[in-house]
């Protein structure tokens, strides 16, 4: 994890720091050449995922896998991308993040059809207002935000590590570490610490008692950050795969909130804040690319925002 994160958390958690990040810190444009490389983007048919896919292709990416829940929506996005970037191979693969079986099938297909993946950006996520459990019969009934944003995301990340660290077929090719970027959020600064101390973490996150959708979202992203820090420190060398977390900030035009807020006043405040200070999906997606392409081994296990390693 970023060395100074724990020491700067209080400062970064202030509303003033949030506004500074949103309004005064520019998100750098990413340049480079991804010719010959293969990338996966989950949740890639809308919002930040689609903007990320478009930017990867603009850097001459050769092969892009759009990993999506809805094949119909994914195919529509792929047609648009293919028309704009005819040089690339754009494929749509099914990935249901509520199902471990779907995740395993997706990774099995990666091994059989791709051999090597250079970049994986795990963008799929959601936020719910009410407590709901997964309905997939192949998945243990858990709260959906916890399942999709954390448990399924880290399961997918672990399964992708071997193919991200695979060597190129050419024996004389210089090995370049794979890149694995999980999408986080700077809302981790606002997690209720008392709740984390009251009982085991997963037990607290899987309880309907006093459920708060925004608190659940923040907690799920904190778990992702903790996982990446542990993974990078103890299990994965940056010489094989560079793993980090990208925080796009508050963005407009995203579709991760699956249901409207019944409190119209609260909804109006949130909508106004997004309209006034929210970044465009294109700006947010630049953070993904900065983490997955520009940042080197120093970012291993760290959180990236505005193109820089946080605090």
Swiss-Prot record:
Keywords annotated in UniProt: NADP, Oxidoreductase
Disruption phenotype: Does not affect the production of oxopyrrolidines A and B.
Pathway: Secondary metabolite biosynthesis
Domain of life (superkingdom): Eukaryota
Keyword Transport carried by entry: no
E.C. no: 1.1.1.-
Keyword Signal on entry: no
Role: Short chain dehydrogenase; part of the gene cluster that mediates the biosynthesis of oxopyrrolidines, polyketide-amino acid hybrid compounds with feature structures of tetramic acid. Does not seem to play a role in oxopyrrolidines A and B biosynthesis. May be involved in further modifications of these oxopyrrolidines.
Protein name: Short chain dehydrogenase opdN
Organism: Penicillium oxalicum (strain 114-2 / CGMCC 5302)
Gene it is expressed from: opdN
């Amino acid at each position: 994890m970023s060395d100074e994160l724990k020491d700067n958390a209080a400062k970064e958690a202030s509303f003033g720091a949030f506004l500074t990040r949103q309004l005064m810190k520019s998100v750098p444009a990413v340049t480079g050449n991804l010719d010959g490389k293969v990338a996966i983007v989950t949740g890639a048919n809308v919002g930040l995922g689609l903007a990320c896919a478009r930017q990867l292709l603009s850097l001459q990416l050769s092969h892009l896998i759009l990993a999506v829940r809805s094949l119909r929506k994914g195919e529509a996005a792929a047609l648009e991308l293919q028309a704009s970037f005819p040089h690339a191979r754009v494929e749509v693969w099914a990935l249901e993040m509520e199902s471990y079986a779907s995740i395993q099938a997706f990774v099995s297909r990666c091994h059989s059809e791709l051999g090597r993946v250079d970049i994986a950006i795990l963008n799929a996520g959601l936020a719910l207002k009410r407590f709901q459990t997964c309905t997939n019969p192949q998945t243990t009934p858990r709260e959906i935000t916890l399942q999709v944003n954390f448990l399924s995301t880290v399961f997918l990340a672990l399964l992708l590590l071997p193919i991200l660290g695979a060597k190129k077929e050419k024996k004389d090719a210089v090995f370049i570490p794979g890149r694995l970027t999980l999408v986080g959020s700077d809302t981790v600064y606002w997690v209720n610490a008392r709740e984390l101390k009251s009982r085991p973490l997963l037990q607290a996150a899987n309880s309907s008692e006093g459920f708060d959708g925004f608190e659940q979202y923040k907690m799920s992203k904190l778990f992702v950050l903790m996982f990446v820090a542990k993974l990078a420190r103890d299990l994965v060398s940056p010489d094989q795969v560079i793993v980090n977390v990208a925080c796009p900030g508050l963005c407009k035009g995203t579709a991760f909130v699956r249901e409207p807020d019944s409190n119209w006043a609260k909804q109006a405040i949130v909508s106004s804040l997004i309209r006034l200070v929210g970044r465009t999906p294109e700006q947010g997606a630049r953070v993904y690319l900065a983490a997955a392409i520009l940042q080197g081994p120093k970012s291993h296990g760290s959180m990236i925002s505005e193109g820089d390693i946080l605090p």
